[in-house]
A protein has these predicted regions:
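Active-site/catalytic core of tyrosine-dependent DNA strand-transfer enzymes
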Residues: 218-277, 282
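Short, polar N-cap/turn motifs at the start of nucleic acid-interacting alpha helices
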Residues: 266-267, 285-305
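Conserved tyrosine-mediated DNA breakage-rejoining catalytic core shared by Y-recombinases
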Residues: 182-223
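A short, glycine-centered helix-capping/turn motif at helix boundaries
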Residues: 159-163, 169-189, 284-287, 296-298
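Non-catalytic DNA-binding core/recognition domains of DNA-processing enzymes
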Residues: 10, 18-102, 219, 272
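Helix-turn-helix DNA-binding helix
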Residues: 30, 71, 256, 292, ...
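Flexible interdomain linker/hinge and immediately adjacent N-terminus
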Residues: 90-150
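Basic, Lys/Arg- and aromatic-enriched nucleic-acid-binding interface segment
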Residues: 132-179
Length: 305
Protein backbone atom coordinates (compact mmCIF):
# COMPACT_ATOMS: atom_id res chain seq x y z
CA UNK A 1 0.00 0.00 0.00
CA UNK A 2 1.84 3.09 -1.27
CA UNK A 3 1.86 6.15 0.97
CA UNK A 4 1.81 9.82 -0.11
CA UNK A 5 4.12 12.29 1.63
CA UNK A 6 3.15 12.64 5.28
CA UNK A 7 1.90 15.94 6.69
CA UNK A 8 1.48 16.61 10.42
CA UNK A 9 0.77 13.25 12.01
CA UNK A 10 -2.00 14.43 14.34
CA UNK A 11 -4.55 17.17 15.00
CA UNK A 12 -7.10 18.19 17.63
CA UNK A 13 -9.66 15.56 16.54
CA UNK A 14 -7.08 12.78 16.68
CA UNK A 15 -5.79 13.99 20.05
CA UNK A 16 -9.33 13.90 21.45
CA UNK A 17 -9.88 10.47 19.96
CA UNK A 18 -6.62 9.27 21.53
CA UNK A 19 -7.82 10.37 24.98
CA UNK A 20 -11.00 8.37 24.45
CA UNK A 21 -9.04 5.29 23.36
CA UNK A 22 -6.84 5.54 26.45
CA UNK A 23 -9.91 4.82 28.58
CA UNK A 24 -9.90 1.29 27.17
CA UNK A 25 -6.48 0.61 25.65
CA UNK A 26 -2.83 1.07 26.53
CA UNK A 27 -0.97 4.08 25.12
CA UNK A 28 0.88 1.83 22.68
CA UNK A 29 -2.34 0.32 21.35
CA UNK A 30 -4.09 3.71 21.11
CA UNK A 31 -1.18 5.19 19.15
CA UNK A 32 -1.01 2.15 16.87
CA UNK A 33 -4.73 2.30 16.09
CA UNK A 34 -4.51 6.01 15.25
CA UNK A 35 -1.52 5.41 13.00
CA UNK A 36 -3.35 2.64 11.13
CA UNK A 37 -6.39 4.86 10.58
CA UNK A 38 -4.24 7.75 9.42
CA UNK A 39 -2.55 5.51 6.85
CA UNK A 40 -5.95 4.32 5.61
CA UNK A 41 -6.83 8.01 5.19
CA UNK A 42 -4.01 8.36 2.62
CA UNK A 43 -1.55 8.98 5.48
CA UNK A 44 -3.22 12.32 6.19
CA UNK A 45 -4.50 13.32 9.66
CA UNK A 46 -8.27 12.92 9.76
CA UNK A 47 -10.84 15.29 11.26
CA UNK A 48 -13.66 12.73 11.34
CA UNK A 49 -14.16 9.02 10.76
CA UNK A 50 -16.31 9.56 7.68
CA UNK A 51 -13.67 7.95 5.45
CA UNK A 52 -14.39 4.61 7.15
CA UNK A 53 -17.91 4.67 5.67
CA UNK A 54 -16.30 3.86 2.32
CA UNK A 55 -15.93 0.32 3.60
CA UNK A 56 -15.58 -1.38 0.21
CA UNK A 57 -12.74 0.98 -0.68
CA UNK A 58 -11.09 0.46 2.71
CA UNK A 59 -11.27 -3.34 2.42
CA UNK A 60 -9.85 -3.19 -1.10
CA UNK A 61 -7.02 -1.01 0.18
CA UNK A 62 -6.23 -3.49 2.96
CA UNK A 63 -6.42 -6.46 0.59
CA UNK A 64 -3.43 -5.01 -1.25
CA UNK A 65 -1.21 -5.61 1.78
CA UNK A 66 0.88 -8.75 1.27
CA UNK A 67 1.47 -9.65 4.90
CA UNK A 68 -1.59 -11.33 6.44
CA UNK A 69 -0.82 -10.19 9.97
CA UNK A 70 -0.49 -6.60 8.79
CA UNK A 71 -3.85 -6.80 6.99
CA UNK A 72 -5.41 -8.12 10.18
CA UNK A 73 -3.85 -5.30 12.21
CA UNK A 74 -5.65 -2.67 10.09
CA UNK A 75 -9.02 -4.39 10.50
CA UNK A 76 -8.38 -4.78 14.22
CA UNK A 77 -7.56 -1.08 14.49
CA UNK A 78 -10.77 -0.01 12.75
CA UNK A 79 -12.95 -2.34 14.85
CA UNK A 80 -11.08 -1.37 18.02
CA UNK A 81 -11.67 2.35 17.47
CA UNK A 82 -15.33 1.98 16.50
CA UNK A 83 -15.98 -0.39 19.41
CA UNK A 84 -14.45 2.09 21.83
CA UNK A 85 -16.49 5.03 20.52
CA UNK A 86 -19.73 3.03 20.24
CA UNK A 87 -21.42 5.73 18.16
CA UNK A 88 -24.83 4.56 16.82
CA UNK A 89 -24.20 6.19 13.44
CA UNK A 90 -21.20 3.89 12.92
CA UNK A 91 -22.60 0.65 14.36
CA UNK A 92 -23.72 -0.69 10.97
CA UNK A 93 -20.34 0.15 9.45
CA UNK A 94 -18.57 -1.43 12.40
CA UNK A 95 -20.54 -4.65 11.88
CA UNK A 96 -19.26 -4.74 8.31
CA UNK A 97 -15.66 -4.46 9.48
CA UNK A 98 -16.27 -7.02 12.23
CA UNK A 99 -17.58 -9.49 9.65
CA UNK A 100 -14.54 -8.84 7.47
CA UNK A 101 -12.26 -9.42 10.46
CA UNK A 102 -14.07 -12.62 11.44
CA UNK A 103 -13.98 -13.89 7.84
CA UNK A 104 -10.25 -13.17 7.77
CA UNK A 105 -9.69 -15.09 11.02
CA UNK A 106 -11.70 -18.07 9.77
CA UNK A 107 -9.77 -18.09 6.48
CA UNK A 108 -6.46 -18.03 8.32
CA UNK A 109 -7.63 -20.67 10.79
CA UNK A 110 -8.64 -22.96 7.93
CA UNK A 111 -5.10 -22.76 6.60
CA UNK A 112 -3.41 -23.35 9.95
CA UNK A 113 -1.40 -26.48 10.51
CA UNK A 114 -1.09 -26.51 14.31
CA UNK A 115 2.11 -28.53 13.98
CA UNK A 116 3.77 -26.13 11.52
CA UNK A 117 6.74 -24.34 13.03
CA UNK A 118 8.99 -21.42 12.18
CA UNK A 119 12.66 -22.07 11.45
CA UNK A 120 13.63 -20.96 14.96
CA UNK A 121 10.98 -23.22 16.47
CA UNK A 122 12.13 -26.19 14.40
CA UNK A 123 15.72 -25.66 15.52
CA UNK A 124 14.82 -25.39 19.22
CA UNK A 125 11.60 -27.35 19.60
CA UNK A 126 11.03 -29.87 22.37
CA UNK A 127 7.86 -31.81 23.13
CA UNK A 128 5.85 -31.02 26.23
CA UNK A 129 6.84 -34.35 27.76
CA UNK A 130 10.48 -33.19 27.51
CA UNK A 131 9.55 -29.97 29.31
CA UNK A 132 7.92 -32.01 32.08
CA UNK A 133 10.98 -34.27 32.27
CA UNK A 134 13.22 -31.23 32.61
CA UNK A 135 10.98 -29.96 35.39
CA UNK A 136 11.31 -33.26 37.25
CA UNK A 137 15.10 -33.02 37.00
CA UNK A 138 15.10 -29.45 38.34
CA UNK A 139 12.88 -30.55 41.22
CA UNK A 140 15.37 -33.27 42.15
CA UNK A 141 18.18 -30.72 42.15
CA UNK A 142 16.16 -28.23 44.22
CA UNK A 143 15.25 -30.88 46.78
CA UNK A 144 18.95 -31.41 47.50
CA UNK A 145 19.58 -27.74 48.35
CA UNK A 146 20.14 -27.11 52.06
CA UNK A 147 19.30 -24.03 54.09
CA UNK A 148 22.98 -23.77 55.04
CA UNK A 149 23.95 -23.43 51.36
CA UNK A 150 21.41 -20.64 50.88
CA UNK A 151 22.53 -18.84 54.06
CA UNK A 152 26.10 -18.97 52.74
CA UNK A 153 24.96 -17.40 49.45
CA UNK A 154 25.97 -20.47 47.47
CA UNK A 155 25.15 -19.29 43.94
CA UNK A 156 24.74 -22.83 42.59
CA UNK A 157 22.17 -23.61 45.30
CA UNK A 158 20.30 -20.33 44.82
CA UNK A 159 20.18 -20.91 41.07
CA UNK A 160 18.83 -24.44 41.60
CA UNK A 161 15.91 -23.06 43.64
CA UNK A 162 15.22 -20.19 41.23
CA UNK A 163 15.33 -22.37 38.11
CA UNK A 164 12.97 -24.88 39.67
CA UNK A 165 10.46 -22.21 40.67
CA UNK A 166 10.72 -20.53 37.28
CA UNK A 167 9.93 -23.63 35.24
CA UNK A 168 7.18 -24.67 37.65
CA UNK A 169 5.43 -21.37 36.91
CA UNK A 170 5.38 -22.35 33.22
CA UNK A 171 4.34 -25.98 33.70
CA UNK A 172 1.86 -26.09 36.58
CA UNK A 173 -0.30 -23.40 34.96
CA UNK A 174 -0.79 -22.47 31.30
CA UNK A 175 2.35 -20.44 30.42
CA UNK A 176 1.99 -16.67 30.70
CA UNK A 177 4.24 -13.97 29.27
CA UNK A 178 7.58 -13.13 30.90
CA UNK A 179 6.50 -9.81 32.40
CA UNK A 180 3.57 -11.38 34.25
CA UNK A 181 5.92 -13.13 36.66
CA UNK A 182 8.88 -10.78 36.32
CA UNK A 183 6.77 -8.01 37.89
CA UNK A 184 5.30 -10.26 40.60
CA UNK A 185 5.85 -9.34 44.24
CA UNK A 186 4.94 -10.94 47.55
CA UNK A 187 1.83 -9.91 49.46
CA UNK A 188 -1.00 -7.78 48.14
CA UNK A 189 -0.71 -4.16 47.18
CA UNK A 190 -1.31 -1.54 44.50
CA UNK A 191 -2.24 -2.12 40.89
CA UNK A 192 1.26 -1.27 39.63
CA UNK A 193 2.55 -4.81 40.27
CA UNK A 194 1.43 -8.42 40.18
CA UNK A 195 1.15 -10.24 43.51
CA UNK A 196 1.44 -13.63 45.17
CA UNK A 197 -0.19 -13.77 48.61
CA UNK A 198 0.63 -17.38 49.45
CA UNK A 199 -2.57 -18.73 47.91
CA UNK A 200 -3.41 -16.74 44.80
CA UNK A 201 -1.76 -14.89 41.91
CA UNK A 202 -3.16 -11.42 41.22
CA UNK A 203 -2.25 -10.09 37.79
CA UNK A 204 -2.69 -6.34 37.35
CA UNK A 205 0.08 -5.71 34.83
CA UNK A 206 -0.01 -7.81 31.66
CA UNK A 207 -0.37 -7.26 27.92
CA UNK A 208 -4.17 -7.37 27.71
CA UNK A 209 -4.91 -5.91 31.15
CA UNK A 210 -6.73 -2.86 29.74
CA UNK A 211 -9.27 -5.07 28.00
CA UNK A 212 -9.48 -7.95 30.49
CA UNK A 213 -8.99 -6.19 33.81
CA UNK A 214 -7.40 -7.69 36.91
CA UNK A 215 -7.06 -11.47 36.94
CA UNK A 216 -6.94 -13.55 40.13
CA UNK A 217 -5.85 -17.18 39.82
CA UNK A 218 -5.81 -19.89 42.48
CA UNK A 219 -2.35 -21.41 42.77
CA UNK A 220 -2.40 -25.23 42.52
CA UNK A 221 -1.45 -26.89 45.85
CA UNK A 222 1.71 -28.49 44.43
CA UNK A 223 2.95 -25.15 43.07
CA UNK A 224 1.95 -23.37 46.28
CA UNK A 225 4.11 -25.79 48.28
CA UNK A 226 7.11 -25.20 46.01
CA UNK A 227 6.71 -21.42 46.08
CA UNK A 228 6.25 -21.16 49.83
CA UNK A 229 9.25 -23.40 50.50
CA UNK A 230 11.35 -21.28 48.13
CA UNK A 231 10.19 -18.05 49.81
CA UNK A 232 11.03 -19.45 53.24
CA UNK A 233 14.47 -20.69 52.26
CA UNK A 234 15.35 -17.47 50.42
CA UNK A 235 14.00 -15.39 53.33
CA UNK A 236 11.87 -13.28 51.02
CA UNK A 237 9.64 -10.69 52.66
CA UNK A 238 6.48 -8.81 51.79
CA UNK A 239 6.94 -6.52 48.76
CA UNK A 240 10.04 -8.44 47.61
CA UNK A 241 10.01 -9.63 44.02
CA UNK A 242 9.19 -13.31 43.70
CA UNK A 243 11.92 -14.01 41.15
CA UNK A 244 15.48 -12.68 40.96
CA UNK A 245 14.95 -10.59 44.10
CA UNK A 246 18.41 -9.03 43.71
CA UNK A 247 17.17 -7.29 40.54
CA UNK A 248 15.52 -4.28 42.20
CA UNK A 249 15.37 -2.05 39.11
CA UNK A 250 13.41 -4.50 36.97
CA UNK A 251 14.77 -3.06 33.74
CA UNK A 252 14.02 -5.95 31.42
CA UNK A 253 12.25 -9.32 31.57
CA UNK A 254 15.05 -10.61 29.32
CA UNK A 255 16.42 -12.00 32.59
CA UNK A 256 13.60 -14.55 32.42
CA UNK A 257 14.45 -15.48 28.84
CA UNK A 258 18.13 -15.96 29.63
CA UNK A 259 17.26 -18.19 32.58
CA UNK A 260 14.89 -20.33 30.49
CA UNK A 261 17.48 -20.57 27.69
CA UNK A 262 19.98 -21.76 30.27
CA UNK A 263 17.60 -24.40 31.62
CA UNK A 264 17.04 -25.98 28.21
CA UNK A 265 20.35 -25.20 26.54
CA UNK A 266 18.31 -23.89 23.62
CA UNK A 267 16.51 -20.72 22.56
CA UNK A 268 13.43 -21.64 24.54
CA UNK A 269 11.78 -18.74 26.34
CA UNK A 270 8.25 -17.94 27.44
CA UNK A 271 6.96 -17.52 23.87
CA UNK A 272 8.34 -20.88 22.80
CA UNK A 273 6.91 -22.58 25.90
CA UNK A 274 3.53 -21.04 25.09
CA UNK A 275 3.72 -22.50 21.57
CA UNK A 276 4.81 -25.90 22.90
CA UNK A 277 1.97 -25.89 25.44
CA UNK A 278 -0.63 -24.88 22.84
CA UNK A 279 0.62 -27.53 20.41
CA UNK A 280 0.46 -30.13 23.18
CA UNK A 281 -3.04 -29.06 24.18
CA UNK A 282 -4.63 -28.36 20.78
CA UNK A 283 -2.39 -29.97 18.18
CA UNK A 284 -4.96 -32.60 17.14
CA UNK A 285 -8.07 -30.48 17.60
CA UNK A 286 -8.15 -28.34 14.42
CA UNK A 287 -8.42 -31.27 11.96
CA UNK A 288 -11.37 -32.57 14.01
CA UNK A 289 -13.06 -29.13 14.03
CA UNK A 290 -12.58 -28.75 10.27
CA UNK A 291 -13.99 -32.22 9.54
CA UNK A 292 -16.93 -31.60 11.88
CA UNK A 293 -17.69 -28.22 10.25
CA UNK A 294 -17.66 -29.81 6.79
CA UNK A 295 -20.02 -32.61 7.82
CA UNK A 296 -22.38 -30.17 9.58
CA UNK A 297 -22.44 -27.84 6.60
CA UNK A 298 -21.24 -24.71 8.34
CA UNK A 299 -18.02 -22.75 8.67
CA UNK A 300 -15.16 -23.31 11.09
CA UNK A 301 -16.08 -19.92 12.57
CA UNK A 302 -19.45 -21.31 13.70
CA UNK A 303 -17.74 -24.01 15.74
CA UNK A 304 -15.14 -21.59 17.09
CA UNK A 305 -17.84 -19.21 18.25
Amino acid sequence: MARPPKSNVTNKFMDTLREKLLEKYSAGTANLYLTKLRILNKDVPFTSLAFLKEHAQMIELMSGIDNANTRKSYLTAVVGVLDCLNVPAYNKINNYYKKALNDFKVDVYNKIDPNEKTTTQKDNWVDWKEVVAKQALLQEQADKVTQKEIDQNNLHAIQALERNVLLNLYTQLPPRRNNDYYLMRLGSGDDESNWYDGKKFTFNVFKTARARGKEVIDVPPALEKILNNYIRMMDLREDDYLLFSHDDKRKSPATMTRALNSIFGKKIGASMLRHIWTSHLLGNVMPIIKENSYKMGHSVGTDLN
